[in-house]
Design a protein with these regions (language model features):
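Catalytic phosphate/metal-binding cores of nucleic-acid and nucleotide-processing enzymes, i.e., regions
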Residues: 1-54
Length: 54
C-alpha cells in the first residue's frame, strides 16, 4: 500500500465515522504520511486505530 493509499484510506474512514472534523482529518492524514515516511508501522497502526475510534 502506497503512502497516498494510506492517506486516502484514513480520510475515508474518518469521514465515514463522522467523528472527525475536516481540519482534524487533514491533520491526521499529514501525520500519517510523515510517520509512514519514517517507516514506523507500529505507531501508524496505533494512531490509525485511535483515529478510527476502534
Amino acid at each position: 500500500m502506497s503512502r497516498r493509499d494510506f492517506i486516502e484510506l484514513a480520510q475515508r474512514v474518518a469521514t465515514l465515522k463522522g467523528k472527525v472534523s475536516e481540519e482534524d482529518r487533514k491533520a491526521f492524514a499529514e501525520e500519517l504520511a510523515c510517520f509512514l515516511a519514517l517507516r514506523n508501522p507500529h505507531f501508524i497502526r496505533v494512531r490509525f486505530i485511535a483515529a478510527c475510534g476502534f
